[in-house]
């Protein structure tokens, strides 16, 4: 059954994935993920009991966002907020580098760090968990398109 709130966001995410323009990727991904956590019981179950705070930003801080998980919910800010202390801060060279890392079938975080595509400060397991959630959302977007 179509979801009037989530489906347009999933289509927007799919359009980001199919285009060469990666700039809006982070914002669209986080917005779609937050709505999916609200309306989809399976997504909500995947974060049940999980508490985590993520900060994503470029070195020049022109692109940034914060995602907070807690109480089977997710909240999003479209700016990098460093207080309270995040569990993980991901500084990425550009949005395309972040997109390639998060949506890879087998995210090579160490390789991305060695190529200086990303710098991670905090617990790497949090980033792997986020990449899993992003891949799940990508699959939902593919089915929706």
Model features per residue range: what roles?
Residues 1-145:
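Feature captures hydrophobic
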